[in-house]
Amino acid sequence: MSPFSIVLIGFAMSTDAFAAAIGKGAAMRKPQWRDALRAGLIFGCIEAITPVIGWVLGRAASSYLSAYDHWIAFVLLGALGTHMMIAGLRNGPDDANDAEAKTPKRHGLLGLATTGFATSIDAMAVGVSLAFLDVHIGVVAVVVGLCTFSMVTAGVMLGRALGNLIGKRAEILGGLILVIVGSVILYEHLGAAT
């Protein structure tokens, strides 16, 4: 497999994470570069590990994973997105004097890791297919991790810009994006199955 193909795989596998990162960045209150880099590192590490896991599991797990990966991603992203939308609705209308609105909001490690895992389940299935190609899985994992790191970091900062434009309702937008990403994953897999 050519280096160009590996980089294309890396960016293709990071698109779901990028979309989720835009949602996370929009939901955060003024995320700083360190927040974006932290999210990028968490997503990048998870996205790098999952194809290796898939590669190790090999052909035996392929049919099991491909049968359920889209449902797992849909449920995880749907639940996280719904939770974010409900939290955004409970926050009430924007208030310039609201002390909470001035306090930066960070997403916890568990929330970022769960979202990172949900957006990387497909990468595990790709890893299974890579087990049958002439490719060094370590190189692929590093490239995928770096691509995801850069895409998620950029996504969080892009989400910040969107969040500043729409205020506290950004959490609703972020949750909606996660639900849409999960729904698209489900739709793509169900559409491919027919």
UniProtKB/Swiss-Prot annotation:
<keyword id="KW-1133">Transmembrane helix</keyword>
<feature type="transmembrane region" description="Helical">
    <location>
        <begin position="147"/>
        <end position="167"/>
    </location>
</feature>
<feature type="transmembrane region" description="Helical">
    <location>
        <begin position="3"/>
        <end position="23"/>
    </location>
</feature>
<feature type="transmembrane region" description="Helical">
    <location>
        <begin position="172"/>
        <end position="192"/>
    </location>
</feature>
<keyword id="KW-0406">Ion transport</keyword>
<keyword id="KW-1003">Cell membrane</keyword>
<feature type="transmembrane region" description="Helical">
    <location>
        <begin position="110"/>
        <end position="132"/>
    </location>
</feature>
<feature type="transmembrane region" description="Helical">
    <location>
        <begin position="69"/>
        <end position="89"/>
    </location>
</feature>
<feature type="transmembrane region" description="Helical">
    <location>
        <begin position="37"/>
        <end position="57"/>
    </location>
</feature>
<keyword id="KW-0464">Manganese</keyword>
<dbReference type="InterPro" id="IPR022929">
    <property type="entry name" value="Put_MntP"/>
</dbReference>
<comment type="similarity">
    <text>Belongs to the MntP (TC 9.B.29) family.</text>
</comment>
<keyword id="KW-0813">Transport</keyword>
<keyword id="KW-0997">Cell inner membrane</keyword>
<dbReference type="GO" id="GO:0005384">
    <property type="term" value="F:manganese ion transmembrane transporter activity"/>
</dbReference>
<keyword id="KW-0472">Membrane</keyword>
<dbReference type="Pfam" id="PF02659">
    <property type="entry name" value="Mntp"/>
</dbReference>
<keyword id="KW-0812">Transmembrane</keyword>
<comment type="function">
    <text>Probably functions as a manganese efflux pump.</text>
</comment>
<dbReference type="GO" id="GO:0005886">
    <property type="term" value="C:plasma membrane"/>
</dbReference>
<dbReference type="InterPro" id="IPR003810">
    <property type="entry name" value="Mntp/YtaF"/>
</dbReference>
<protein>
    <recommendedName>
        <fullName>Putative manganese efflux pump MntP</fullName>
    </recommendedName>
</protein>
